[in-house]
Amino acid sequence: MYDTQVMIVGAGPTGLTLGIELARRSISFRLIDAAAGPFRGSRGKGIQPRTLEVFEDLGIIRAILKAGVQYPGFSVHIGPLSLRLGPMGGRKRATEGVPYPNLWLLPQYRTEQILRERLAQLGAQVEFGTAFERLSPDNRGVRVHLSSGESVTAEYLVGCDGGHSAVRKALGLGLRGDTLHTEAAFVADVHLEELDHTDWHVWPFAKGGSIALCPLPDASFFQLMSPREPADGIEAAILRATGCQVRQVAWSSMYRPAVRMVDQLRVGRVFLAGDAAHLHPPTGGQGLNTGIQDAYNLGWKLAHVLRGGPESVLDTYEAERLPVAAAVLGLSKHLYRTRSLKRGDATNQLRLHYRTSTLSLGKPLGRLHPGDRMPDVRLADDTRLFEQMCGTHATEFVTREGARILIRPDGYIASIGTQRVTSYAGEPTHVVDGSATDLDRSSIHS
């Protein structure tokens, strides 16, 4: 007898996304977090285009777009000279295939708040002040021991509890990789009224490194980034660089830039996701986004198996996400080493794919392969394909040539063929007439 189907440890963006995915499929779960209350810092402030597509499916894209802004341009200050540069990643126009082409700026605490509000709409909530202590796995489930003294038996446990993951440590798994800098770096949210709020300001140091202030959507707040905590205090360091007085320090944190990951994402009935499985430096805005993608990949698979689907489906979580984590870590490391302000298409996560997955079947159709992200297209009735895909179902897209593209619940192509597929992952497929569309024009793959 189980107390709940899934126990989720950690209520950051990864755990919240997983909770939403389970809640909208009517899977019972508990979502616990050791913190006394919600996270209040801006830390993971960059939301990539692929994550914005996920947020459309989760039903929160309007709230996310309303609360955030496009990334600002840079002002680099060297003595009396100020150079104004374009925004990170440039500014791209939305296309038929890519409705959200630009990196979106939103403080992490606000992203989490919107995710919690969506979770509440689905009838669930976070249990703050409840810590995971240890686990007792067996073949039928996982017994989770909590700081309250309670023991909970779940069919599956998912550790989404960050870089210092207690779940990962309980499994005996280590993080392999590199520490990129021997000294801890510093980040803080500061209130400045005198500094121009339209640009991301950077003051390079003569011996390397810089102090930077990125404007946040909240009026007059900036995210401060520094190679180390200023010896004479935040206020003095900012006054020295900018001539501006700090009105408030709302949040601050130290971190040691690293690229590290586990060798496996699953041990029996226990899974790891997000920073519990892979640690990223802040460069490239990959950490928060990769964790959300982990949860988005795992959620529908857990639900399918809990409804009677084959257990082997869960093996594809590690098979699909571990190579992605390795690739993203490599990109983050490169961006950190080069210190480049330029961002190419590699950071937007739109080209990540699962072509080698056992769930990807059939032959390519033009530039589209099984395992690719399905592009958005405008349909004959003037709706968008992504609108038709929203929900927990898989979608079957029928081309003008009669090919049938089966799209998984997470937006990736499961198969390309000619046979009608009536159900996928335990739910009826939704058929979409794509006879009036040009897929090659929408695809970003080659």
Where are these regions (language model features)?
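N-terminal Rossmann-fold NAD(P) dinucleotide-binding loop
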Residues: 15-16
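Glycine-rich FAD pyrophosphate-binding loop
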Residues: 23-44
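Core beta-strand elements of the Rossmann-like FAD/NAD(P) dinucleotide-binding domain
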Residues: 2-4, 147-156
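A conserved short coil-to-beta-strand element within the FAD-binding core of flavoproteins
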Residues: 128-142
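Active-site-adjacent segment of FAD-dependent monooxygenases/related oxidoreductases
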Residues: 43, 48-118, 216
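Conserved FAD-binding catalytic core of PHBH/FMO-like flavoproteins
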Residues: 117, 156, 160-257
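Helical substrate-recognition/capping region of FAD-dependent monooxygenase/halogenase enzymes
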Residues: 1-5, 9, 24-25, 34, ...
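FAD/FMN-dependent oxidoreductases across multiple families
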Residues: 67, 229-290, 322-324, 328
